[in-house]
UniProtKB/Swiss-Prot annotation:
Transmembrane in keyword set: no
Superkingdom classification of source: Bacteria
Catalytic activity: guanosine(527) in 16S rRNA + S-adenosyl-L-methionine = N(7)-methylguanosine(527) in 16S rRNA + S-adenosyl-L-homocysteine
Annotated keywords: Cytoplasm, Methyltransferase, rRNA processing, S-adenosyl-L-methionine, Transferase
Name of protein: Ribosomal RNA small subunit methyltransferase G
InterPro entries noted in UniProt: rRNA_ssu_MeTfrase_G, SAM-dependent_MTases_sf
One GO molecular-function entry: rRNA (guanine-N7-)-methyltransferase activity
Source organism of this protein record: Francisella philomiragia subsp. philomiragia (strain ATCC 25017 / CCUG 19701 / FSC 153 / O#319-036)
Amino acid sequence: MDSMKDKIRQALVELDIQATEEQIEQWLEYLKLLEKWNKVYNMTAIKKIDDMLVKHLFDSLAVAKYIKGSSTVDVGTGGGLPGVVLAILYPQHQFTLVDSVGKKIMFLKNVKKSLGLDNINPLNIRIENLNGSFDNIISRAFSSVDTFYELCKHFLTKDNQMLAMKGPDLEEQNLVSLPLDIEKHSIKVPFLNAERNLIVMRKK
């Protein structure tokens, strides 16, 4: 466990993120819960906690600096990625975690209780049926960017942003058709030798 903590500390240095020992403990506790529930409920294709550390925790932390304001909706959150990871980092920021799969929301309610995360609100709802206003609308491995936009455009204002976490495929053909200002950021994930990108979309 200490070696995992050391790896987290090293990743935080690489990402230029300040975090307390308590937050590091919370991230590890979250991953342990995810690993445990995964054995029964198939929450994620990644089975081993060592792999989750890099492909889930560090991947989520790598976009932390792009989160603005005080509220975020995590669309198709699954096991709480990136929402739970970022909620631990930003305790003053409110995260609404949305998924249409009931067992995943059941897991997230367990995470909320176990870790005492008062700033997450897990909702078993389809995103197109959710109302509200958010500074960030984020998704990780949820859908194509054009589908993401179609399902979430009712949230978009001139003051907020949509963030799509992506692998190497930037979906240029889909981005061209969107009536949005688009920024593409190459994301370096500690200990991960794979191309990761963040697409930030704002109203023109």
